[in-house]
């Protein structure tokens, strides 16, 4: 009877998934799933970064990082097995449009809550709070030791990362060079087109670790504060609440801390634990 009961629940779950595809709401779910045949069942598409070591990184055909761990936990809590999770690379410039056109069901990509306009997407979380940091070539670490040394220099930022205006406020006569991705900023830094990269400290640590050889170094005191959220399509407030509940469970059962420890082992980064884990507030705030 136990096996039959479990089978019945699984069949019911597939019916719910199918009803979602057909646009019905009998199962009271907000998530959009696609069916790739009965063998695989419903899948969930999650937009992630592929170029942020320690957070979202694609290497050898496998995704890894803290954001990936968070995405997997949330998807599992929503009822999706590992084989039903499909990761798709998104860029800051495509995150919102990928949600709007249904390419992905959610985005877990170092997505700061202040990166979007009101009503553009639904947000859940936050799940991590970070500071900003400066990343320089090691041979410049003696002359660029912090934000006070940025005057007259060129600082690279990636779209969707540290806002350009906040970098301009750090020092007089600083030139901000905005690139599409962090690897582009890293290349600019290595060939001398930029003197520093301004990025979230988690991202800066990942870039330095991945480059290896001591070529890059995080310098100075961290500054500013940003909180990472999970984004879903505008209007999916029920799904945002479900994700909030999953994130809270991750923090409560120790899985969040395990993911943090794994990130430390990978890139040597530990977030400011006076700010983490952050309070889950975003889906509730969107109702106000």
What are these regions (language model features)?
Residues 94, 110-119, 166-169, 190-191, ...:
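A ligand-binding cleft/hinge motif common to bilobed small-molecule-binding domains
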Residues 85-97, 142, 177-187, 191, ...:
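Short helix-initiation/N-cap motifs at beta->coil->alpha
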Residues 48-54, 63-78, 112, 131-186, ...:
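Bilobed "Venus flytrap"/periplasmic-binding protein-like clamshell domains
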Residues 28, 68-78, 138-140, 161, ...:
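Extended ligand-binding regions for polar small-molecule ligands
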Residues 33-107:
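Extracytoplasmic small-molecule ligand-binding "clamshell" domains
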Residues 22-26:
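C-terminal motif of bacterial Sec signal peptides marking the signal peptidase cleavage site
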Residues 50, 128-136, 205-247, 266-288:
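Periplasmic-binding protein-like
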Residues 85-149:
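Acidic, polar ligand-binding/catalytic clefts
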């Amino acid at each position: 009877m136990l096996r039959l009961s479990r089978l019945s629940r699984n069949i019911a779950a597939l019916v719910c998934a199918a009803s979602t595809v057909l646009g019905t709401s009998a199962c009271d779910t907000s998530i959009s799933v696609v069916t790739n045949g009965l063998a695989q069942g419903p899948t969930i598409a999650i937009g992630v970064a592929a170029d942020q070591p320690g957070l979202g990184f694609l290497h050898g055909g496998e995704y890894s990082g803290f954001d990936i761990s968070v995405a997997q936990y949330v998807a599992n809590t929503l009822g999706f097995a590992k084989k039903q999770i499909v990761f798709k690379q998104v860029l800051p410039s495509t995150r919102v449009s990928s949600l709007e056109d249904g390419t992905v069901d959610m985005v877990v990509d170092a997505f700061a809550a202040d990166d979007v306009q009101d009503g553009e997407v639904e947000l859940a979380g936050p799940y991590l709070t970070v500071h900003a940091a400066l990343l320089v070539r090691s041979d410049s670490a003696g002359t660029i030791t912090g934000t006070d040394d940025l005057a007259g220099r060129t600082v690279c930022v990636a779209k969707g990362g540290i806002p350009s205006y906040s970098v301009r406020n750090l020092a007089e006569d600083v030139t901000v060079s905005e690139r599409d991705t962090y690897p582009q900023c890293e290349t600019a830094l290595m060939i001398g087109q930029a003197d520093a990269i301004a990025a979230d400290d988690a991202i800066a640590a990942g870039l330095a670790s991945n480059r290896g050889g001591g070529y890059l170094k995080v310098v100075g005191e961290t500054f500013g504060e940003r909180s990472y959220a999970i984004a879903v399509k505008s209007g999916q407030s029920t799904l945002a609440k479900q994700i909030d509940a999953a994130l809270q469970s991750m923090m409560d059962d120790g899985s969040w801390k395990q993911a943090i420890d794994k990130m430390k082992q990978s890139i040597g980064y530990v977030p400011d634990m006076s700010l983490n884990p952050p309070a889950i507030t975003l889906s509730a705030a969107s109702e106000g």
